Amino acid sequence: MRYHVVLFALAARLRFAHAQDIATQAWPSPTPGVFSIPNFSFDSGETLDSLDIHYQTLGKLEISDDGRTNAVHIMHGSIARGDQLLTEEFAGSLFNAGQILDADKYFIILRDGIGHGNSSGPRNTGLHARFPSYQYNDMVRADHQLLTEHLGVNHTRLVMGVSMGGMHTWMWGEMYPDFMDALMPIASLPVEIAGHNRLWRKTFIDLIRSDPAWENGEYASQPLVSLLGAMGLLQVMFQGQELMQREYPTRNQADNFFAQSFEAVLAHPDDYDVNDQIYAWNASWSYDPEPELEKIRVPLTAVNTADDLMNPPQLGILEKLVHDRMVRGLGRAVVVPTSNATFGHGSYIKASLWVDELASLLDQTIIPRVARG
């Protein structure tokens, strides 16, 4: 199944494509776990008695005498979860034997961020709209606690992420600059969410909150009218213009595509819980790594695609900030040209588009590890 066919329907993508990929996977089966953080304090001043972070790992952790490890921390996108990355398009290009992140050589960490997947969030805690208003900073801090306090990782070989996870990657480089050998943010920009990107997110949130069926977050069933409207907006933002015109060149084809997408949502509406989505999209409100980019101390390769409506290359933001605000020589900005292989923002899931850049980054940052005696 082509990834873009279900675009925003990440749960549907996981239900169908993930099941097929697992049946033919060559990478090791992941080991799941849960880390419970007591009395987690959010930047909003709110606290949660117990914050559960669900995670999966592949491979075995190896720690050298100098504290360096073979750990690779990879972060998913908004309204997704770690399973998003266990597909043939992603894991099948990275984690198999002999590939760049061979799971027999690396300890790969895939967590569900706060409010996503099986980690604590508005829906699965029963708190609904009373769940603490988390921001990206909270998510990164919780990840750091997961790695250091639970998994025993105090230094990683690589921190990388896609979309929201890409934004978190910039933050990791600033908040914990000595924690990794290399950074690779994908499908993101190191600048606050403003302009067009903020407007569509705010429209998405306000559309749901203005629906009487939302009932201030205490609905008994998903408010379908606003849910479908919001997901339609996300559909438009997620796809590439060239791809949409190429594959749906007539009015009827475009309408049918939208109808099929809506059917995927209506078949499993709880997979798109609107409280979870409101929180997830609002979590970017305080994101703004630009002022502290000079804090990044390790090589970084940022990759976007030319047909990404969420991170439009014509703004020139990525190249300018990497060149002007980062320590000279540490950053590299890459924009993958539009092609039949790209499909807008969601192109990040197709690791074949950027795996060569990852290989180059890892080669650049090889640091001899001191073996334990």
Can you name each region flagged by the protein language model?
Residues 18-74, 78, 82-84, 88, ...:
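Catalytic-loop region of hydrolases
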Residues 25-26, 197-198, 203-306, 310:
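Alpha/beta-hydrolase
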Residues 56-125, 317:
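N-terminal cap/lid subdomain of alpha/beta-hydrolase-fold enzymes
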Residues 113, 184-194:
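Active-site nucleophile loop of the alpha/beta-hydrolase fold
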Residues 137-158, 171, 175:
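Conserved acidic catalytic loop of the alpha/beta-hydrolase fold
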Residues 161-165, 169:
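Gly/Ala-rich beta-loop-alpha elbow adjacent to hydrolase catalytic centers
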Residues 309-317:
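Conserved alpha/beta-hydrolase "acid-adjacent" motif
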Residues 326-373:
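Catalytic active-site module of serine/aspartate enzymes centered on a nucleophile-bearing elbow/loop
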